[in-house]
Curated annotation (Swiss-Prot):
Principal EC category: ligase
Record carries keyword tRNA-binding: yes
Extent of Gly residues compositional bias: 894-910
GO molecular function, one term: aminoacyl-tRNA deacylase activity
Chain positions covered by the region annotation Disordered: 893-916
InterPro entries named among the record's database cross-references: aa-tRNA-synth_II/BPL/LPL, Ala-tRNA-lgiase_IIc, Ala-tRNA-ligase_IIc_anticod-bd, Ala-tRNA-synth_IIc_core, Ala-tRNA-synth_IIc_N, Ala-tRNA_lgiase_arc, Ala-tRNA_ligase, DHHA1_dom
Domain of life: Archaea
Pfam families: DHHA1, tRNA-synt_2c, tRNA_SAD
UniProt-recorded name of the protein: Alanine--tRNA ligase
Originating organism: Natronomonas pharaonis (strain ATCC 35678 / DSM 2160 / CIP 103997 / JCM 8858 / NBRC 14720 / NCIMB 2260 / Gabara)
Classification via PROSITE patterns: AA_TRNA_LIGASE_II_ALA
Aminoacyl-tRNA synthetase in keyword set: yes
Database matches in SMART domains: tRNA_SAD
Gene this chain is encoded by: alaS
Cofactor(s), by name: Zn(2+)
């Protein structure tokens, strides 16, 4: 028996007459009431046998099934709580997307650090599992977007030494009760509980583990019951399936997952889950794509659906071989089966992906090249590719809106705008990337090698070219490429984790002396405008910084703000009767604030601290202004706008936001007006210190715009309607900011816009600098400041006209040179003519002359000696001369190099004196190439 076998000997199983058996097909152990049953009941050991014969008494819609589940657990003393967003990185910094309901409570609740919102609780949590993307459509049961109905109970062992160390105590319920709830729910819905099997499948993940049970009914996994009670421990008593050892924790958690879509499917018995979940959309897509089956074909498709569970890429090594087996079982050719089911599989995937996009974009994810934005873009482009391939011509934004409407999102207009913008970007990406793929295909075709998978993934990552496009282009150029069935899962896995925590930037690191010090009392929160204080020196640590001796001073209390949250540290002085130390930096580590000084006060001495008041005030103004500008941006641009980064300075601040397009000048002015209205309203800047659960319940997860602070208690800053978890210093009233001026915007990366602004005196100074530049320009142009724009536009148009005229004259000169007007040597090459000529001009002159010659069917060999020796060689299509090779030989004669494609190349070298000699050798070089 395995280490956890005893964990499955539940009182409920024995009381209800279950038997424990081993599946002869897969070897899994399972519990059943049916003494005659041999197999576990899960595909591929069994087929779906509820298709056309629903497994429940009543047919349910998604909404009805969700309500039936939640009401059942409410009737059994669970509190219903609202679902969290699908973007888990809005309240966690270790993951990107919500993949299970337990994500809502990790790691703080599951570890016992903070209490759950209710105990026990029930929830129906929208989730997205990118790793299932390649299975969607094929297996009949996989959906990338789904709702995990769940009930959770958080328990702590009663025999631990210090029960107060955890936010909950005692046992609510455990394994037997959990299985009993599931069994009773199935029974109430009319399931034949004799046909239900409970498969033992220990769970490991994220350093935790425990026994788990898969609930299988008529070939379909309906639920997983996880009992999280162990943690990874090299000295643990239990070795589990991942090869690691585990020991029991003081806390233990009931973590269940009931797939809403699958329960709904079971109640309806449709051919696949997709007809049960998206009936209207599937019908629309089939009509739009012109999919129409005869009665025989419809029957064949439905029979294939019963067997589609065998196409799970996680269970089979070769999906196409599995499809061959299904075709054999159905008595048809694989090609006929594929022609019928593959378009339908694409339709299913489109519907699912549109729902996934509705969740992502509706919850404020903005497509980009990183994080959740990357994943959203990947799904969107795959959906567009599938739609084009199967012949769906309805605009993608309309398809996504169908799902957003059903999910009842209020920001549907923004969602549609984002989709339209992304579709256009995708079209441009394909146009730019096609030539690159063609060159790559030609390269590997010449080698006789297939294009490697790493190259295909890199093409997708860096250029957005999907593998199917690579496959098509490669075939046109005689190159092979093998695309694995789980390609998109592999790509998603690369981008599915949040970035690791960055260095905390502390001065002292893990210094043992710091660890022994008490936390510093922070005075700046209660009196942010005060700049002087007194304190006791607790410790002074001498350090070497680039050859200079500096000191880290720890005090019992401080007014100095340590660097953090994008706000620089305060500066100032620490003084005693004997020492006046300059404070140049302040950092915090483990609650201890360290003041970097150039001199050392004595340990145990009283010191007088003096903050640089002007610097502190400007930093406070810019920090509060950052909150205001962020709120104003959301008011103007939409609720999807979220902070992507911020840095407050003395002269200005920058605020990065996630937004799908460039911010227009008119939008900048509107943001500025909204922000300054908040300033002139002179609103109080409030702070409070609620428990984390209370803060999230009252204000949602947008409080974490600036990052996710640790601990059970949060500091919240409220400015009007805007509420943020924030540890920075702020003004007391918005009127203390004075004014806010947005200085510039820029696109710092795809999907991220940067707003640079100044507040207070810094805003006035920035405005004056801009005015100075305007007045200086007006003086140079000899016009009034008001006339500068029109004058600049007139000069620009004149400059463009003159540039065009210069180009025309250059072309005329090139034509004259090309037709013998400038002393070029004509060389007879036997069937074609070459012109070898020195043209002392810039590279544009050389290219223009070469192009003119080639258009007349003449080989051009041109040289210039302005600053260095430069060559351009151009060859007509029908001439067997390699321009790159010619340039290489010429450039070698002037001490340089060069090359290029066979039809046009350039190069050169530093030896100008050898230019004419090199050109004299050109005729012989050309003839030797033709003879070769």
């Amino acid at each position: 028996m395995s280490d956890l076998d005893e964990e499955y000997q539940l009182d409920y199983f024995h009381e209800e007459g279950f038997e424990r058996k081993e599946c002869p097909s897969c070897g899994a152990h399972f519990w059943t009431r049916d003494s005659e049953r041999d197999i576990c009941g899960e595909p591929p050991c069994a087929d779906y046998d509820f298709i056309g014969d629903p497994g429940f008494d009543t047919e349910y819609s998604l909404e009805e099934m969700r309500e039936a589940f939640l009401s059942f657990f409410e009737d059994h003393d669970h509190e219903r709580i609202e679902p969290y967003p699908v973007a888990a990185n809005r309240w966690r910094d270790d993951v990107l997307l919500t993949q299970a309901s337990i994500y809502d409570f990790q790691p703080l609740v599951t570890s016992g650090e903070t209490p759950p919102p209710a105990n026990p609780l029930t929830i129906s949590q929208p989730c997205i599992r990118m790793q299932d993307i390649d299975n969607v459509g094929k297996t009949g049961r996989h959906t990338m977007a789904f709702e995990m109905m769940a009930h959770h109970a958080f328990n702590a062992r009663e025999d631990i030494d210090d029960p107060d160390q955890y936010a909950y105590e005692g046992e609510v319920y455990w394994k037997s009760e959990t299985v009993a709830y599931c069994d009773q729910l199935l029974d109430e819905l009319g399931a034949d509980i004799e046909d239900v099997t409970y498969i033992e499948d220990p769970w490991v993940g994220g350093g935790n583990a425990g026994p788990a049970i898969e609930v299988i009914y008529r070939g379909l996994e309906l639920a997983t019951l996880v009992f999280m009670c162990m943690e990874q421990d090299p000295d643990g008593d239990y070795e589990l399936k991942d090869g690691n050892r585990y020991s029991y924790m003081d806390t233990y958690v009931v973590d269940t997952g009931y797939g809403l879509e699958r329960w709904t499917w079971m109640s309806q018995g449709t051919p696949t889950v997709y007809e049960a979940v998206y009936p209207e959309m599937i019908s629309f897509l089939k009509d739009n794509a012109g999919l129409d089956y005869s009665d025989r074909e419809e029957s064949l498709v439905n029979r294939a659906a019963r067997l589609s569970g065998k196409l799970d890429i996680d269970d089979v090594d070769d999906v196409e071989a599995a499809r061959d087996d299904i075709a054999d079982e159905l008595g048809v050719e694989t090609d006929e089966l594929r022609a019928l089911v593959e378009p339908l599989e694409d339709i299913y995937a489109i519907a699912d992906h549109c729902r996934t996009l509705a969740y992502m974009l509706g919850d404020g994810i903005v497509p980009s090249n990183v994080g959740t934005g990357y994943l959203a873009r990947m799904v969107l482009r795959r959906t567009k590719r599938l739609a084009d391939g199967v012949g769906v011509d309805a605009p993608l934004d309309e398809l996504v809106d169908m799902q957003a409407e059903r999910l009842d999102y209020e920001n549907r207009d923004t969602v549609r705008d984002i989709v339209r913008t992304e579709v256009e970007k995708y079209r441009e990406t394909l146009e730019r990337g096609r030539r690159h793929v063609e060159r790559l295909a030609e390269e590997y075709a010449q080698k006789g090698d297939p294009i490697p998978l790493d190259e295909v993934i890199e093409l997708y990552d860096s250029r957005g070219i999907q593998p199917e496009t690579v496959e098509e282009i490669a075939a046109d150029h005689g190159a092979d490429v093998e695309i694995p069935d789980d390609f998109y899962s592999l790509v998603a896995e690369r981008h599915g984790e949040a970035d690791a925590d960055a260095d905390d930037g502390t001065l002292a690191g893990d210094d043992d002396r710091i660890a022994d010090l008490p936390e510093t009392e922070k005075l700046y929160y209660e009196e942010p405008e005060r700049t002087d204080f007194e304190a006791v020196v607790l410790d002074v640590i001498e350090r070497d910084a680039d050859g200079e001796t500096v000191y880290d001073v720890a005090l019992d209390q401080t007014m100095f703000y340590p660097e953090g949250g994008g706000q620089p540290a305060d500066t100032g002085t620490l003084s005693t009767d004997d020492v006046a130390a300059e404070v140049t930096d302040v950092q915090e580590t483990n609650g201890v604030v360290l003041h970097r000084t150039d001199e050392a006060p004595g340990k145990g001495e009283f010191v007088r601290g003096q903050i640089d008041g002007v610097r502190r005030r400007r930093l406070m103004q810019h920090h509060t202004a950052t909150h205001i500008v962020g709120h104003a941006a959301r008011q103007v641009l939409g609720d999807h706008v979220r902070q992507a980064g911020a840095q407050k300075g003395v002269e200005s601040a920058r605020f990065d936001i996630r937004h799908y397009e460039r911010i227009s000048r008119e939008e900048v002015k509107r943001i500025e007006r909204v922000a300054n209205n908040i300033v002139t309203d002179n609103l109080p800047v409030k702070q409070e210190w609620p428990k984390r659960n209370e803060a999230e319940a009252d204000y949602g997860f947008d409080i974490y715009q600036g990052g996710i602070p640790p601990g059970e208690t949060l500091r919240l800053i409220q400015v009007g309607e805007d509420v943020q978890a924030c540890a920075g210093t702020h003004v007391l009233q918005t009127g203390d900011i004075g004014t806010i001026k947005i200085l510039s915007t820029e696109r710092v990366q795809d999907g991220v816009e940067r707003l640079v602004f100044a507040a207070g005196d810094a805003a006035i100074e920035a405005t004056q600098r801009t005015e100075d530049a305007l007045y200086d320009t007006a003086e140079v142009l000899d016009v009034s400041p008001q006339e500068v724009p029109a004058t600049a536009e007139r000069f620009f148009e004149e400059w463009k006209d003159r540039g065009k005229r210069i180009e025309e004259l250059k072309e005329q000169l090139a034509e004259a040179r090309a037709h013998g007007g400038d002393g070029g040597e004509e060389v007879d090459l036997g069937g074609t003519t070459a012109v070898v000529q020195r043209v002392d001009g810039d590279m544009d002159d050389l290219r223009a002359t070469a192009n003119a010659l080639v258009e007349d069917g003449t080989v051009a060999v041109l040289g210039s000696g302005d600053d260095s020796a430069t060559f351009v060689v151009a060859v007509p299509d029908n001439v067997d001369i390699n321009a790159g090779a010619v340039v290489g030989e010429l450039a070698d004669r002037v001490g340089g190099g060069g090359g290029g494609p066979p039809d046009f190349a350039q190069g050169g070298g530093p030896d100008v004196d050898s230019l004419d000699e090199a050109l004299d050798a050109a005729p012989e070089i050309l003839r030797s190439m033709l003879e070769a």
